[in-house]
Amino acid sequence: MDSTTTPPSLRSNTRSALRLARNNKTLVKSHIPSLDLVLLSPKNNNGTPYPSPVSLSSPSSPVTLREILLLSPSPLRKSRTRLSNRFDMEAAEAAVTARRSKTKGGQNGLLASPSPRNFRRSRLRSEAMVDTKENTEPIVVVTDEKKQNQRKQKKLGRSKKEKHSSVPLLASPSPSSDQPQDVCQGDLERIRENISDLIMWRDVAKSTLWFGFGCICFLSTCFAAKGFNFSVFSAISYLGLLFLGVSFLSNTLRQRVTEEARRELKLSEDDVLRIARRMLPITNLAISKTSELFSGEPAMTLKVAPFVLMGAEYGYLITLWRLCAFGFFLSFTIPKLYSCYASQLNQKVECAQRRFVEAWGVCTHKKFVAGSAVTAFWNLTSLKTRFIAVFIIVVVIRYRRQNLQLDSEDEEEKKQQEKTHPEQQKSPEDKSTSPRSAEEEQALVLVAETKAPKKLY
């Protein structure tokens, strides 16, 4: 018979037959049939059942061994997925073997039938591939579980990070406590800048508006309140009377008769803390300024002492209203005038000091003049003024001594610099002398050139 290729369905049956032949050598003693010559359909039309081993051992069995081997299932029970994978692999290998047979036997025009060895090799390869797939499947599942665990851990990590990030935001009161102080300091600086702009007349329109409004208010009160004597106690009494009348009117209009409906005004700790935070920068500024004024330095003492003395001597004439009026007018006039005429005033003061020193140096009877001045002051003044005069003289002496010490220290530093760097100081002097000499020579040449034509004429 001509050799023809077997379909894939028969290949699987031949494999199962070979497997049974290996396992049942004791039962099967008949001759091994040739698989290449006989071809039978995989389906049994007669519907004969599977025979028993006893009937197989008998030689006169109606069913041939070929049919039994083809119809017998495989002894190994495999899963459906494994069988489907095996059939797919076998179909793919059958296509590959068909292509190989076509390439080899294409010249003769015949299809070569595969040998049993090729079936065995393909079967071993398919089983090896299925085993590797089965071995790799749990690994894939593990990796998937790891990925899922990693994703869960990432989500948990993110939630923990969000919790950690949200906790300090909720439990960090330090920035909130620092914010009111910064706001108050910013408000104070803004108020200070606005006041300095008004006093120094940087914005002329705004300064003139405020100055005119203040002048009208103070002048109107001076003319209208001639017989009015101001006192703090009377002012508080008038304010209390006004508040009492307003509260009575509000009570009658709203008809609040019952005590239960009345509102109780109480201050809480938050209110006190809020007020303290608002007042803290102002109090710190006042304390710092007072500490600067009363620091005890000679220069600052000489500046503050005259104002304190005037307040002590003429304090009974100064009232709150007059103080506000004088402060208003002086604040709008003195700073601007001093900034404009500061250089001229300093020159005049220096000239007066120079003249006094020259007159004192020219005077021949210095001791007599000094003694007469001291005795006249001592006899014409009171004990209080004597004490104040002695205090001021001591402050002046200390101020003078401090200035002398500073001048001596500056001179010593200059001498040390001259000793340490004599060459560096000489070199710029030499450089400065050389251009001066060149300039002088050029000036002399120009003068000579200008004078020469005059002599000719």
UniProtKB/Swiss-Prot annotation:
It is a multi-pass membrane protein. GO terms for cellular component: endoplasmic reticulum membrane. InterPro entries: Reticulon (IPR003388), RTNLB17/18/21 (IPR044647). Its main location: endoplasmic reticulum. Keywords: Endoplasmic reticulum, Membrane, Transmembrane, Transmembrane helix. It holds the Pfam family Reticulon. The chain crosses the membrane at residues 208-228, 230-250, 314-334, 377-397. The keyword Zinc does not apply. Residues 149-163 have a biased composition (Basic residues). Residues 94-183, 407-457 are annotated as: Disordered. It comes from the Eukaryota. Residues 166-183 have a biased composition (Low complexity). It is found in: Endoplasmic reticulum membrane. PROSITE patterns: RETICULON. This is Reticulon-like protein B18. It comes from Arabidopsis thaliana. The gene is RTNLB18.
